[in-house]
Regions:
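Conserved metal-binding segment of the jelly-roll/cupin
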Residues: 87, 126-142
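A short glycine-rich, His/Asp/Glu-containing loop-to-beta-strand
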Residues: 70-89
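A short beta-strand-loop-beta hairpin characteristic of the jelly-roll/cupin
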Residues: 90-95, 102, 110-129
Length: 161
């Protein structure tokens, strides 16, 4: 596990952040009724996602994220998805999950500052800080939260080899 603050060049990150915060309609968001594949649909926890890449580009936003692919020096890209966890009055810890059952690399790119966080299996809590990247093995259990002090918590989840 590694945390890197101010990972991206400030100019590029400001453009990236603008897609989410200043021009939210540029990204089509899709409602996901469950937090993960092991989570019951009976629960009220849900979020919005935008699948950018899985086996092939699924979004025009992929071209804008090419610097991410280059900076991570990956052998193979598995998936890129953007997440939008809307705010609630109380912070909600989402159920733990694994992104995939095989060992691989992962990164969570925080787009905005908020009181949300990612909780790793060992108890490490990684706060959502704009331009912070968490590098970790997403085949290990981890969980997300929403936020209470912004309209939403935005991040980009990257899975790769």
């Amino acid at each position: 596990m590694k945390i890197v603050d101010n990972f991206f060049d400030p100019t590029y990150f400001k453009e990236l952040q603008s897609f989410f915060l200043d021009q939210p309609t540029r990204i089509p968001w899709f409602f996901v009724p469950t937090m993960n594949k092991d989570h019951s649909e009976d629960n009220t926890m849900s979020y919005f996602e935008h699948l950018v890449y899985q086996e092939h580009p699924n979004s025009d936003f992929y071209n804008f994220l090419e610097p991410v692919v280059e900076l991570f020096q990956m052998k193979e890209l598995i998936r890129i998805k953007c997440n939008c966890y809307t705010a609630t009055e109380k912070l909600v810890n989402h159920p733990s999950h694994k992104d995939y059952d095989f060992t691989h690399k992962g990164a969570i790119i925080s787009i905005n500052n908020c009181d949300g966080y990612t909780l790793l299996q060992d108890g490490t809590k990684v706060n959502s800080v704009a331009n912070r990247v968490l590098f970790f093995d997403p085949s290990e259990m981890h969980s997300s939260t929403n936020c209470t002090n912004q309209k939403a918590r935005f991040n980009i989840n990257v899975n790769y080899f």
